[in-house]
Regions:
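A general structural motif
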Residues: 61-63, 121, 179-181
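A solvent-exposed, charged loop/short amphipathic helix patch at secondary-structure junctions
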Residues: 82-101
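C-terminal cap/substrate-recognition subdomain and adjoining C-terminal extension
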Residues: 2-4, 34, 131-215
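Short, acidic loop-to-helix structural element flanking the phosphoryl-transfer center
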Residues: 55, 96-125, 132-133
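Sec-exported extracytoplasmic/periplasmic mature domains
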Residues: 41, 45, 80, 115-123, ...
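Soluble non-cytosolic domains of exported or imported proteins
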Residues: 8, 23-30, 34, 100-108, ...
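Non-catalytic pre-domain segments flanking phosphatase-related domains
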Residues: 1-68
């Protein structure tokens, strides 16, 4: 049981302070992006390299792409979390305002990694559960940060768009029909597996997570 001295708001504040100031947090994220970036040439040269779990007989013929989550993988929402603490509120209170502000900063190493991916001729698909109404503001946020995003094809695939729900897997299946997915990046197991596999017990989640390297 929790002691009388336990204060949830204090714990939330400590978590936000850690994410914003800890060198270890900064380095861990930047190092992850660096490691994946170093694998780009290997992934491109090996045309059988496939980070998606479903096989495609045409995999060797398909152009390369990556699938990456947005919030807490690319964009740092810790200022929003701090705002919740200051206002003694909780998610989703104020989330719409935060997204429309388009003022999130990038997590360490994210922009450099994405530019490297694009410069190597790899398409980037941003698969996010932000609602479709935030598409314009999310694109604006990306452009402020210098994050590459296509103006020719829709590579920002959002919840509520085309009937998509919380499950990201159908969006990835669509991408995999026309691209060889060489990397998947995210901060949540649901960024990698179907929704039904993300709603299971802790031990089973750990087993599935061992198949992936989560950011």
């Amino acid at each position: 049981c929790l002691s009388d001295d336990f204060h949830p708001e204090q714990q939330r504040m400590l978590a936000v302070i850690y994410s914003q100031t800890a060198a270890e947090h900064h380095v861990a994220i930047k190092q992850t992006y660096s490691i994946v970036g170093d694998l780009i040439k290997k992934a491109l040269s090996d045309t059988s390299w496939n980070a998606f779990t479903e096989d495609n007989a045409r995999i060797n013929e398909l152009p390369p792409a990556i699938v990456i989550d947005v919030d807490e993988t690319i964009l740092d929402n810790s200022p929003y979390e701090a705002r919740l603490i200051f206002n003694s509120t909780s998610y989703p209170e104020g989330w719409d305002d935060w997204c429309f502000e388009a003022s999130a900063q990038a997590l360490p190493g994210a922009v450099e990694f994405l530019k490297k991916v694009k410069n190597n001729g790899i398409e980037i698909f941003y698969v996010t559960n932000r609602r479709h109404k935030f598409e314009s503001s999310t694109r604006e946020n990306f452009k402020k940060l210098g994050i590459p995003i296509s103006d020719e094809i829709d590579t920002l695939l959002m919840r509520d768009e085309n009937g998509w729900g919380d499950d990201k897997y159908p969006r990835k299946q669509m991408i995999a029909k026309n691209y060889r997915i060489i990397f998947q990046l995210g901060d949540n197991l649901g960024d990698f597996v179907p929704l039904k596999e993300n709603k299971i017990g802790p031990n089973e989640r750990k087993r599935i997570a061992d198949l992936y390297h989560c950011l």
